[in-house]
C-alpha cells in the first residue's frame, strides 16, 4: 500500500440485494489531491462515500483512509475526516452559530480554534448566524454544511454532490472555496453528476452502474477521445437526430445542448473527409437546407458517452 496515498481502495464490492452498487472498485487518491467521482445518479458514488467514511461495510475488498482500515479503525477515521452528505443533514431548528458550536463540541474543539480554516466561508454566513438553518437559502445551507464538516480541521474532506440543486453562481463560489482548502493541504474527495465540474479536479474517476470506467486527469481523459467529433445543427433538431442515427457512417449520435454530437465509424483523415461530404449529401437528400456541421473538441461528457456500452 502506497503511503503517499491518503485513500486506497482495492477490489471493493457492494450489493443491495440483486443490485450491484459497486463492482471491483480500485482507486488510489494522493495526499493533498482534489479528486472527483463523476457520474449520474445510481453510479455508486454515495455508496463509495459511505464505505470510506465508515458508515457502510463493503461486501468484499479492502479500503483505507489515512493508512487506517475502514473496518478495523473506524473510530479513528471518523476523527480524521469531514463528511458533507448529499442531503442537508444539519439541525434545521438550530441557528447557524448553534450548529457550528454543536459540531465543534462533538470534536472537542471550538470555532475560534480553527477559525482560520473556515474564515473565508464563515464571513459569508456570519450575517445570518442567528437565523435557523432550515430558513437558509440553498447556497447558504451549503456553506454552513461545509463549515461544520471543516470545524475540526480534518485531514480528508468528503463532499457528496455538494452543488446539486445550487444556483450556478454558488456552484462556482463553492469550487473556488475548494481550491483554497486544497492549498491548506486537505485531501478532498468530491462527487458530482455535473460533468462540467470535472475540470476543477486534479484527477477524476468516471463512474457508471457501480464501475469505474476511467481514471485520469481531465486532460488525460479528453486525450483518449480518438474519433472526430462533429456538432450538427438544424431547425428540425428532433427529426435530424433520427436521420443522423440512420446515416450509414454514424458511429454514435446524441443530443447535446443546442446541437447533436456525432462521431463517425471512419477514423482516417482522408476517409473522414469523404464521409463528411457524404453526410452533407445525405442530409440534403433528406430535405435539409439549413444544416451546419462543425468539428469540435470533446468535453468530459463526450468522453463519458464514448465509454458507454451502447455508445
List each language-model region with its residue ranges:
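Conserved protein kinase catalytic domain
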Residues: 78, 119, 222, 304-305
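ABC transporter nucleotide-binding domains
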Residues: 7, 14-207, 214
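Short, charged/small-residue-rich alpha-helical element at the C-terminal edge
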Residues: 226-311
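ABC transporter nucleotide-binding domain
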Residues: 176-265
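Residues that form or flank phosphate/diphosphate-binding pockets in enzymes
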Residues: 72, 113, 216, 239, ...
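ABC-family P-loop ATPase nucleotide-binding domain
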Residues: 1-13, 310-311
Amino acid at each position: 500500500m502506497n503511503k503517499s496515498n491518503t485513500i486506497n481502495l482495492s477490489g471493493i464490492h457492494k450489493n443491495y440485494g440483486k443490485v450491484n452498487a459497486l463492482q471491483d472498485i480500485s482507486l488510489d487518491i494522493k495526499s493533498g489531491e482534489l479528486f472527483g467521482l463523476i457520474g449520474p445518479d445510481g453510479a455508486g458514488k454515495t455508496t463509495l462515500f459511505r464505505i470510506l467514511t465508515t458508515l457502510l461495510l463493503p461486501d468484499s475488498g479492502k479500503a483505507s483512509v489515512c493508512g487506517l482500515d475502514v473496518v478495523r479503525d473506524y473510530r479513528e477515521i471518523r476523527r480524521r475526516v469531514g463528511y458533507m452528505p448529499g442531503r442537508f443533514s444539519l439541525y434545521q431548528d438550530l441557528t447557524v452559530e448553534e450548529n457550528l458550536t454543536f459540531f465543534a463540541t462533538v470534536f472537542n474543539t471550538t470555532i475560534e480554534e480553527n477559525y482560520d480554516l473556515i474564515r473565508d466561508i464563515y464571513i459569508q454566513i456570519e450575517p445570518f448566524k442567528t437565523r435557523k438553518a432550515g430558513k437558509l437559502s440553498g447556497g447558504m445551507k451549503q456553506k454552513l454544511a461545509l463549515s461544520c464538516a471543516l470545524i475540526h480541521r480534518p485531514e480528508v474532506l468528503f463532499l457528496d454532490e455538494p452543488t446539486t440543486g445550487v444556483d450556478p453562481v454558488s456552484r462556482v463560489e463553492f469550487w473556488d472555496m475548494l481550491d483554497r482548502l486544497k492549498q491548506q493541504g486537505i485531501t478532498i474527495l468530491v462527487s458530482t453528476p455535473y460533468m462540467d465540474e470535472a475540470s476543477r479536479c486534479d484527477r477524476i474517476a468516471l463512474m457508471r452502474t457501480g464501475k469505474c470506467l476511467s481514471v485520469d486527469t481531465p486532460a488525460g481523459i479528453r486525450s483518449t477521445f480518438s474519433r472526430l467529433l462533429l456538432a450538427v445543427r438544424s431547425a428540425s433538431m428532433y427529426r435530424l437526430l433520427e436521420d443522423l442515427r440512420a446515416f450509414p457512417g454514424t458511429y454514435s449520435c446524441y443530443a447535446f445542448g443546442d446541437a447533436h454530437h456525432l462521431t463517425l465509424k471512419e477514423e482516417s483523415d482522408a476517409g473522414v473527409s469523404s464521409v463528411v461530404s457524404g453526410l452533407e449529401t445525405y442530409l440534403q437528400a433528406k430535405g435539409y437546407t439549413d444544416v451546419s456541421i462543425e468539428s469540435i473538441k470533446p468535453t468530459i461528457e463526450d468522453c463519458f458517452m464514448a465509454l458507454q456500452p451502447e455508445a
